[in-house]
Amino acid sequence: MFLLHEYDIFWAFLIISSVIPILAFLISGVLAPISKGPEKLSSYESGIEPMGDAWLQFRIRYYMFALVFVVFDVETVFLYPWAMSFDVLGVSVFIEALIFVLILIVGSVYAWRKGALEWS
């Protein structure tokens, strides 16, 4: 028979971990000042008022390089545990990792051919 009392610690942890962030948001909403003056709405950088427009637009190339970096960084995060337990795992896991790497290679070749890695 399925006994719910075996999961009491789990339910207590779930309730507590849900209530604490909710309380933190509620308390900060009650205690935070509501009025926003001109000091709050102005840009602040190193104690100096900004001259001209404070917003700078970045070129899309920065985002493309960052996106490619994140993809390969996540690849490293996924492949590191596999590499550490390579001798324990079987051939099927090796084939799965090979397919994963091949998909990423195809994606990088596609990005390269589309010009995502060219700066000019």
Swiss-Prot record:
GO-annotated cellular components: chloroplast thylakoid membrane; NADH dehydrogenase complex
Parts of the chain that traverse the membrane: 9-29, 64-84, 88-108
Catalytic activity, EC: 7.1.1.-
Gene Ontology biological-process annotations: photosynthesis, light reaction
InterPro entries on file: NAD(P)H_OxRDtase_bac/plastid, NADH_UbQ/plastoQ_OxRdtase_su3, NDAH_ubi_oxred_su3_sf
Domain of life: Eukaryota
Membrane topology classification: Multi-pass membrane protein
Reactions catalysed, as given in the entry: a plastoquinone + NADH + (n+1) H(+)(in) = a plastoquinol + NAD(+) + n H(+)(out); a plastoquinone + NADPH + (n+1) H(+)(in) = a plastoquinol + NADP(+) + n H(+)(out)
Keywords: Chloroplast, Membrane, NAD, NADP, Plastid, Plastoquinone, Quinone, Thylakoid, Translocase, Transmembrane, Transmembrane helix, Transport
Compartments where located: Plastid, Chloroplast thylakoid membrane
SS bond list: none
Family annotation (Gene3D superfamilies): NADH:ubiquinone/plastoquinone oxidoreductase, chain 3
Molecular function GO labels: NADH dehydrogenase (ubiquinone) activity; quinone binding
Recorded family membership: Belongs to the complex I subunit 3 family.
Assembly: NDH is composed of at least 16 different subunits, 5 of which are encoded in the nucleus.
Summary of the function given for this chain in its UniProt record: NDH shuttles electrons from NAD(P)H:plastoquinone, via FMN and iron-sulfur (Fe-S) centers, to quinones in the photosynthetic chain and possibly in a chloroplast respiratory chain. The immediate electron acceptor for the enzyme in this species is believed to be plastoquinone. Couples the redox reaction to proton translocation, and thus conserves the redox energy in a proton gradient.
PANTHER family: NADH-UBIQUINONE OXIDOREDUCTASE CHAIN 3
Protein name (record): NAD(P)H-quinone oxidoreductase subunit 3, chloroplastic
Gene: ndhC
